[in-house]
Amino acid sequence: MMQFQRDLEASLEAVSANAQELLKSLKSRKDVQDLNASLPKDPLDNCDAQTQAARAQLAEAATRILQLSIRPQEYLEHLQNGYQHLTCFRWLVELNILDHLPHSGTISYTDLARKASVPPMQLRSICRMAICNGFLEEPEANQVRHSRISALFARDESYLGWARWMVNYSVPAAYKLSDATRSWGETVAKDQTAFNLGMDVKVPFFDHLRQTPAMKDAFAAYMRNVTSNATWGLQHAVTGFDWASLPRGAKVVDVGGSLGHGSIAIAKEHTHLTFVIQDLPETVAGARKEMAQNDKIEASVKSRITFQEHDFFGPQTVKDADVYFLRMICHDWPDNEAKVILSQIRAALKPGAQIVIMDTILPQPGTISVLQEQQLRIRDLTMMEVFNAKERELEDWSSLMQSAGLEISRVNQPLNSVMGLLTVRSAGQTALSGTNTLTPELVAAVSASTGSADSRPVLIAGAGIAGLCLAQALKKAGIDFRVFERDSHIDARPQGYRLKFEADAAQSLKNILPDDVYEAFELSNAVTAVGETDFNPFNGNIIHSRTGGGLSGKKGLYATFTVDRKAFRTQLMTGIEDKISFGKEIAYYKTDDATSTVNAEFKDGTHVTGSFLAGTDGLHSVVRKTCVPNHRIVDTGAACIYGKTVMTPEFLARFPEKGLRFMTVVSDIAPMLQSCLIGDSPVTLLLEPIRFSEASRARYPELPPDYVYWALIGPKERFGSQEVTSMKNFVSLDQAAEQAAKLSLAVTEEWHPSLRALFELQDTKQASLIRVASTIPDIPSWESHSNVTVLGGSIHPMSPCGGVGANTAIVDADALAKVLVEHGTKPPVNAIAEFGAAMRTRAKRNIWRSEVGSKRMFGQKNLVDCSEFVF
């Protein structure tokens, strides 16, 4: 109650003081209304700044008084006035009533209805509703005339265009916002917006705009008025950034600059600058024509401005600019798209270059005038309704910049401007500052968003098994992280299908995974059957077969789980989907000892800073090449085709039944004379049936049909060295898969038909051919770093013949997670060194096991005698 009284009293005092100031100014003005003028003028036109300030404060106080004086029971009545007034306004605009209203004097409703060809009773009711809201006047009974408000629309065609834009496009879109939410929920799709529902169109806004001339004209009128409005005016672009500090001849790129009005305004004031205005081809063509025909632009300005066709989602082609200027660009796009725009610019930044963003900075509620905040909230909702985009608070801007590898160095919120100016640089080059127009809360928001090393996430390069296991372990421990995967999505390429985990990996998984994820993992596994059957490839007869035996107990592989790789990776992503970014390949990284941080640069031009970097990015690891530059990876001389054959009725009828019980091995040894040339090097087929229990399928219906996993491995010469080398030249994964499938048939051409059914009925899109790489068992130590390490296949790749590569990676992830949990994300160097030493010991044992298997399966040499692997 007391707060209500204080607010009412303050608003009344503001009304009184500012009304008196406004009246005093108006009475002192020399210019008086011209009684012979054709249209009424606004008495508040051409007032000085002090008077305009008083007017704005009066409007603000009056608005607050209205809000305070309306009772809750009257709120809906107040809304009724709003939508009925809007309905009447649209009626007057769309039926061109203003065209028939005389510029001076009055006209009867009867005569106006006849001129406009509308029903007289409708006209009178609608005009009187408009009069209630100040749009028209009725000085005497049944006689209507322009008010100072309607006169503006009769005087300025662009305002009428803006009005048409509002009632025909903005309002229908706004009305459908709840329907859009109901239909699509949270989405960034440009063709799933309230605008699409309101206009009943299937294409995004700008596509429809290009196809609809009337809409394009209305939108252009709207934009002209936006840019001419003082609060949106270009003068703030001229004065809001220190353009004078740029060197003579400095280049400014106006990204998405449309007709170039912003650059022209700046160029007029700062004659030492040159400008490149970028936009889409159609826009650039119109802009060039308009500038050529505009005699009001001086030749000295035109000579310093060029236009360039450019799509800001593509690579930025101007790489020598001093400033990239984005005015009202980012707010049209959700964070992912805005990040792409900024990342493309960041990739082109030369040292010292800056990005100047002029766009809306949403305030915290109640921190600015209610009328100004209303306009900003309107823009925020409009972005949502039309583009599934948003206006951003300062913290949102800072987060967006960080995601694109940028940092805000300065924020300026000009007085009486609805847009602020953000000065942005590449991350690590900034020193945050602000102007006295910033509130302490806004400055604090920027400071908080930059973060300290302790608050920065662990960066995980690679969303393979090691990377995802580490991520789950960190999540379980409450440590922030981000995962970056080079592939575009989880199924971007075949990566093998079956994995077998032994006791050590099973225990690590139990340590790593939350209880619910571990339970789901157990239930999604395939049925494990222990044993081996060996076949003669040429007659299809069984050579050896044994259930259990050496593959069980303490004598062999200790097989605990049989896992479908895709199902396993899906389980590993459970609960951390929002932390994984696909299509992110690291180009390089650098550490900063002063801040104890690591900065990763991606090939798409984006950047991220973290407290620690874990390289799990596979054989081609960029992290390993930087962290352990002399690490030895050898070429085993083998190639391997991985494949998958679904257990269809036809396959089950053709393939030997006893070959589908457990692990099956088929060894094709070279004939006598051929072995003289290439050695007695066999090609070996390993296969295993992957079957899921009824309980697993009931819980996870998305599990694949039962299938046979197989791997055909042998010397590259048996596959054709040229074929193996040429695989990387295929332009698509489908082509490479098809060629690998054909190669599997060629290599097994003389095998028994029953066994060849495996290859003849394979899913040809799932085949993949790889060269088999490994490191040597005795991995040399390397200099450790407190911010970076490598693990899994990134540092100790091994032949699949041992079947323990994934096991080793899982245990690595568990071990590293324990280090980070114990010491935090800035562990001492000795802790990382101890982790590395233990990992090398573990890897040595498993690499040796793979080496033994490789010698038996394809005649591999000792790993230390193998040549270097050529990437």
UniProtKB/Swiss-Prot annotation:
Swiss-Prot/TrEMBL keywords: FAD, Flavoprotein, Methyltransferase, Monooxygenase, Multifunctional enzyme, NAD, Oxidoreductase, S-adenosyl-L-methionine, Transferase
InterPro entries: COMT-like (IPR016461), FAD/NAD-bd_sf (IPR036188), O_MeTrfase_dom (IPR001077), SAM-dependent_MTases_sf (IPR029063), WH-like_DNA-bd_sf (IPR036388), WH_DNA-bd_sf (IPR036390)
Binding sites annotated in the UniProt record for S-adenosyl-L-methionine: 279
Recorded phenotype for the gene knockout or disruption: Abolishes the production of cercosporin but accumulates the naphthopyrones nor-toralactone and toralactone, as well as the oxidation product of nor-toralactone, naphthoquinone. Adopts a dark yellow-brown coloration, with slight export of pigmented metabolites into the agar.
Keyword Cytoplasm set for record: no
Enzymatic reactions: nor-toralactone + S-adenosyl-L-methionine = toralactone + S-adenosyl-L-homocysteine + H(+); toralactone + NADH + O2 + H(+) = 1-(3,4,5-trihydroxy-7-methoxynaphthalen-2-yl)propan-2-one + CO2 + NAD(+)
The keyword Transcription regulation appears for this protein: no
GO MF, one example: O-methyltransferase activity
Identification of the protein by name: Dual O-methyltransferase/FAD-dependent monooxygenase CTB3
